[in-house]
Amino acid sequence: MNYQHWLSLAAARFTHSDSPKRDAEILLSFVTGKARTYLLAFGETEITAEQLLWLETLANRREQGEPIAYLVGEREFWSLPLSVSSATLIPRPDTECLVEQALARLPAMPCRILDLGTGTGAIALALATERRDCAVIAVDINADAVALARHNAEKLTIDNVCFLQGSWFEPVSGRFALIASNPPYIDANDPHLNEGDVRYEPHSALVAAAEGMADLAAIVSQAPGYLDPGGWLMLEHGWQQANAVQELLKNSGFSAVMTCKDYGNNDRVTLGQWAV
């Protein structure tokens, strides 16, 4: 069987996927070690028997709904190839909106940045890459996530970021010009938890008590004790939680509170500035 034939058959199997053709190309690229552009340009190339066996195993798992990122162990975020595992949430493109807002509000001079619930290290590494003059601290309660984030930093030779294990602000001290977080914010009863890729991701990285608001509220309540005067707090949240997060920030004394849209035009990131 050649590349072109396998891609066609695989894409037809991935009916549950939003991007079946892309999924097939990623799997074939992973197994053959060839770039996706090569696969399309040389579609008549024959696949070896060993590669076909491996591809069939991966295709079966994808057909059952297992995320592509877990199958190949990698997901790109902010043009950074990040290793991923089942211990972490898979980085989403919409989280890049938070990175954009953070970069737009960081002071021009070197400063300290805090990323809470870092997972793969996506937000921390993106900010550390763009602002090599800044010191980035990133925290996660999951030891496996911290180890993975450190691996990503080493792989990408990013040396201005430090990863710590602990619950939210517990392992950190001092103040920061900006605190960013993509915490768990999904209600435990949300039916979407039983659909698509989310079924395979760790619920501890997705679900929060109090209808998804508990961790957001905990971060907002503690953040003033860790922000520089004029510092910013930026939170990713669910598309229906913007008003609730805005109220949390305003009630805690934040000003310039606003919500930004994601790439799908949904409310996704709410931010506020601590008193100057």
Curated annotation (Swiss-Prot):
Gene Ontology BP annotations: methylation; translational termination
Stated family: Belongs to the protein N5-glutamine methyltransferase family. PrmC subfamily.
Gene3D superfamilies referenced in this protein's UniProt entry, alphabetically: DNA helicase RuvA subunit, C-terminal domain, Vaccinia Virus protein VP39
Enzyme Commission number(s) from the entry: 2.1.1.297
Residues bound to substrate: N182, P183, P184, Y185
Species, as recorded: Yersinia pestis
Binding residues annotated for S-adenosyl-L-methionine, in chain numbering: G117, T118, G119, T120, G121, D140, W168, N182
Keywords, comma-separated and alphabetical: Methyltransferase, S-adenosyl-L-methionine, Transferase
Reported function: Methylates the class 1 translation termination release factors RF1/PrfA and RF2/PrfB on the glutamine residue of the universally conserved GGQ motif.
Protein name as annotated: Release factor glutamine methyltransferase
InterPro entries recorded: DNA_methylase_N6_adenine_CS (IPR002052), HemK-like (IPR004556), Methyltranfer_dom (IPR025714), N5-glutamine_MTase (IPR050320), PrmC_N (IPR040758), RF_methyltr_PrmC (IPR019874), SAM-dependent_MTases_sf (IPR029063)
Molecular function per GO: nucleic acid binding; protein-(glutamine-N5) methyltransferase activity; protein-glutamine N-methyltransferase activity
Catalytic activity: L-glutaminyl-[peptide chain release factor] + S-adenosyl-L-methionine = N(5)-methyl-L-glutaminyl-[peptide chain release factor] + S-adenosyl-L-homocysteine + H(+)
